[in-house]
Every structure is written in C-alpha cells, then in structure tokens.
C-alpha cells in the first residue's frame, strides 16, 4: 500500500506516520532523506541535485520525481511506502499522476490553525536533557523550570507564535490545495484515484490513530 499523509506542521503527522509504517511494515519516505542519501552515495541524480543546491537553487520537481521513482523500486518498498512531505505542491502531485505512480490512499489530518498554534507555542524545553513540557497539556510542577534540575525552560524559536503562523501560511498557500486536488480526483474517477480521507486531528493520539486505521482498513 502506498500512502500519502497530509497535514499542517503540528498536526501530528510524525507520530501517526510511525504507527502506519510499523503496522503495514512499509518505510516512511521523505524527500529530504532521499536527497541526502543520493548525495552521500554520489549517484548521478545525487550529483545533479548537489550541483543545484551548491548554486543556492531549489532542486527541481523533475529531479525529486526521479529520486522518488528510484526509491519506490527498492526492495523494502515492495509492500508499499508512506510518503512524508511529498508531494508538497500541485505540480508534484500532477507529475506523480502523469508518471502513473499508483497511490492507494491519501489521508489528511485536519487540525484548526488556532489549536496548532496553542499546541506548538505552548511547548517548553529543558535544553540539557531534551525534556519537553507544555504550559497547558503537560506543565512543569513549577512554572518555567524543569521538574528534575530546577533549571529554566525555554521556548524554541520554531515554536514562537509568529513562526508557527508563518509556517501555517506557507502550508495553506502551497500544500493545502493538494487536499482539494485529491478530493476532486476521487469524485471524478473512483477507479483510478487514490482513496481520500480527511481525519479530524483533535483528541488523543490513540483516538486519531484509531480513526486513521479505520479508514485504511475499510
């Protein structure tokens, strides 16, 4: 089974991706990992991508798609794979379709912007140990300090409200149109299109996991 998992940053894709990957015994494929591996192995595509990146440019969809085709033909992908962060744009989704790369299921984890902002901007971290807290959902015993060492907790720059809002804006402009694309494709062509499911991402990790697996096993 080949699965695409969509959702805004902070929607909980990473956690659910691990569950899916383990349950179906399929690898989680990220374009970033593929690029790094190809560059490290100095494959022809890796060298081509490195040259583009060294020039300070973005790697083209054409190169990304070639990497994807190479990766899904490797032995560990015979049972399928889970795409993580791909496709990112309508152009990439359309290219996948034109290449006749079969996708069985597209799952969107849908969480309201304000809930994502609350989730992410409430995170606090103890840098030395990596212990993570949340001001609402998992607060430290004493506000602003680590339970064990008593040292101060920090808010990572990535988790500030301003940064989260910017990341959400990029997602809604660039990646969210994929949701309409896959939904409309399924409506027009039930036989060829991947099954599309939108899952509400509010609730416990287990509740969301159950909803996703109900759709995948339907």
Curated annotation (Swiss-Prot):
Residues the record lists as binding ATP: 10-15, 123, 132-133, 203
PANTHER family: NUCLEOTIDE KINASE
Record has Nucleotide-binding as a keyword: yes
Description of how the protein assembles with itself and partners: Monomer.
Region (LID): 122-159
Pathway participation: Purine metabolism; AMP biosynthesis via salvage pathway; AMP from ADP: step 1/1
Compartments reported by the entry: Cytoplasm
Function: Catalyzes the reversible transfer of the terminal phosphate group between ATP and AMP. Plays an important role in cellular energy homeostasis and in adenine nucleotide metabolism.
CDD domains: ADK
Organism lineage: Bacteria, Pseudomonadati, Chlorobiota, Chlorobiia, Chlorobiales
Name the UniProt record assigns to this protein: Adenylate kinase
Top-level class of the enzyme under EC nomenclature: transferase
Organism: Prosthecochloris aestuarii (strain DSM 271 / SK 413)
